[in-house]
Amino acid sequence: MEAFLKEFGDYYGYPDGPKNIQEIRDTEFKRLDKGVVYLDHAGSTLYSELQMEYIFKDFTSNVFGNPHSQSDISSATSDLIADARHQVLEYFNASPEDYSCLFTSGATAALKLVGETFPWTQDSNFLYTMENHNSVLGIREYALAQGASACAVDIEEAANQPGQLTNSGPSIKVKHRAVQMRNTSKLQKEESRGNAYNLFAFPSECNFSGLRFNLDLVKLMKENTETVLQGSPFSKSKRWMVLIDAAKGCATLPPDLSEYPADFVVLSFYKLFGYPTGLGALLVRNDAAKLLKKTYFSGGTVAASIADIDFVKRRERVEEFFEDGSASFLSIAAIRHGFKLLKSLTPSAIWMHTTSLSIYVKKKLQALRHGNGAAVCVLYGSENLELSSHKSGPTVTFNLKRPDGSWFGYLEVEKLASLSGIQLRTGCFCNPGACAKYLELSHSELRSNVEAGHICWDDNDVINGKPTGAVRVSFGYMSTFEDAKKFIDFIISSFASPPKKTGNGTVVSGRFPQLPSEDLESKESFPSHYLKSITVYPIKSCAGFSVIRWPLCRTGLLHDREWMVQGLTGEILTQKKVPEMSLIKTFIDLEEGLLSVESSRCEDKLHIRIKSDSYNPRNDEFDSHANILENRNEETRINRWFTNAIGRQCKLLRYSSSTSKDCLNRNKSPGLCRDLESNINFANEAQFLLISEESVADLNRRLEAKDEDYKRAHEKLNPHRFRPNLVISGGEPYGEDKWKTVKIGDNHFTSLGGCNRCQMINISNEAGLVKKSNEPLTTLASYRRVKGKILFGTLLRYEIDEKRQCWIGVGEEVNPDIE
């Protein structure tokens, strides 16, 4: 920390503030002492505990009323709302004579309001920077629908003094991309261009990269448009209005509207001080507000209306004209306390504090190297790391590379960060233009990715050797050096490959070396293997039952994962979402043809006949991972039982054996499913999961050696923690990794490779209580990671023998064919 303070000590920690950063953390963010490192302030910053105390003291000490009423309390509430508007305008240094503050449900609603009320004509143009949020891109739909043109642009700065006029014009240039039009027959006459209104939109700070845009764009687009747009088809267009998306940037450096008089500015208050959510604002120049065309009217926006004839007289004040319905007056009351907090620290001090942390992290990531000298990190955004430049906000966006130059998937980073208590964000952050621009993804690649099944928030982080998104960390006013340091330490320990010493003392590049252990030394021959246990899981994500002997079929173990529980919105319910599903016990009596289910939450056991008319085929369809299946809907009593057992509305579905069924994950998640050649029920990846007792024993040794507290607090892991179908005994730890095929008794299986583990194995069921921790996944991640996957256990496909009825039994010999 000494080196950090030497460089940033004058800027970090609020040295001139009422409290320094440590005092702020100790008194207002005690909840972060539980090991949470929160680095997603670009998504939402955190509320202060002191801030919330003030808010709820206000709520419990005062009475608030609907501002549309005329009582004393309602009038006082109206005055409070007016004061809040002034606070917002003051924060942006905007005069009430020039601007009005309209409260909305968020920045997105504010942008939508601009889009739907802007005076579009077929001669209008909508220009927007590539680095814009989807909520800004959505305005394009309104423009194109009215026959206007739309075009994405890139901003180029040619000099060190942005906006200054030179002999060749201003140093800022707007470079346009393809022009989009739906009315291709439209003719742009020069005289009509002069009468139409046009809109230019840009963010004060890019939420993808943290790049801060030069606010001189406001004046240049309004006063020097022809030169700035020189060479584009828009250079002759007049009457440009400017919209700034300040949702990301205003938390640390709000635009000064007295100097940069944008026509529209949008924000969300949870980005500023964490609470309230669901409240934003549109700051609109009063002269611009007069041009907006609003169709709908509502309570609060009319002076008078007549129900049975076409007559309405609207209110004239800007706020009353545009704000439909009753204002969210309690949320508006809460923002006063948030602004009080920001004012005590000052935006300039917050800017210096947060940006010093982001610059520190960027420098550390830039310098990070693998053991072979290859760079670990690729950064996106401004390369200027001077705090005084104001070129970049407190955001660091990057991707990580392996020593061989291939990419770590961003989901791997997110998974491991979560295990380390670090909360960050991955993907494209709803900013497709910036994402494509920085990742150098062409239109054909973007379309190809979509055709391959890639959509927002899915698992496809690397396609055709290129990342589809990135990793983002961002800092807020309460972030500390310790947060930044823990993040850097995490990156180094998890992704930077150190030099590795070999037995003869030479150094080579390595990654996740095996821990020294006599048990891991190679042996000349394998001891005998045998099948230790068999477990059938009739209902996906519920508890299974062990058997001594069980029949095999085309889908694996008979009735394994043949049922699943579906939520009301169509999602598959699993232990990831509902950990209590592990408490639901199951058993199948083959002779009686009964599936029995029990739960501590239900008094009676549930009995379901496996062959029964209670499964009535219906016309509705269930779409799971792009596979259309026929629903087998259970009786009302069965669905009611599962609703009580799980604690949410749901229904039980059975896989239709008459349907030719491929892997659940085909198409939607390329590469996730290993078993594309055979039929499976509701399993994720393959028919069988095999776990080795010896591998589990080695994992237990590592856990005990790593953490004495863990050893005292937890029992040794049981192989069934990993939900295997088959547990084997014998052999060496992880010997199953090398299997190509395996024969168990008289049955043949093909190895499909390792099983990719997730946080589900961190859920334990001890004495009927569901508990979550970071283990064993954290320890497995330290030595079982292979190209973004944490592998433990082996997936198998059963090579069915159609000529005979096949069974598998405990105690049978296991004979692997090793690669």
From Swiss-Prot:
Supply the enzyme class, top level.
Answer: transferase
Expression across tissues is:
Ubiquitously expressed.
Q: Keyword Protease, does the record have it?
A: no
Chain positions with N6-(pyridoxal phosphate)lysine modification: K271
Alphabetical UniProt keywords: Molybdenum cofactor biosynthesis, Pyridoxal phosphate, Transferase
* Record annotation: effect of changing G106E: In los5-1; induces a deficiency in stress-induced ABA accumulation
The record, for Pfam families, names: Aminotran_5, MOSC, MOSC_N
Q: Report the protein's function.
A: Sulfurates the molybdenum cofactor. Sulfation of molybdenum is essential for xanthine dehydrogenase (XDH) and aldehyde oxidase (ADO) enzymes in which molybdenum cofactor is liganded by 1 oxygen and 1 sulfur atom in active form. Modulates cold stress- and osmotic stress-responsive gene expression by acting as key regulator of abscisic acid (ABA) biosynthesis.
- HAMAP family reported in the protein's UniProt record: MOCOS (MF_03050)
- Give the family, as the similarity comment puts it: Belongs to the class-V pyridoxal-phosphate-dependent aminotransferase family. MOCOS subfamily.
- Protein name per the record: Molybdenum cofactor sulfurase
The taxonomic lineage of its organism, from the top, reads:
Eukaryota, Viridiplantae, Streptophyta, Embryophyta, Tracheophyta
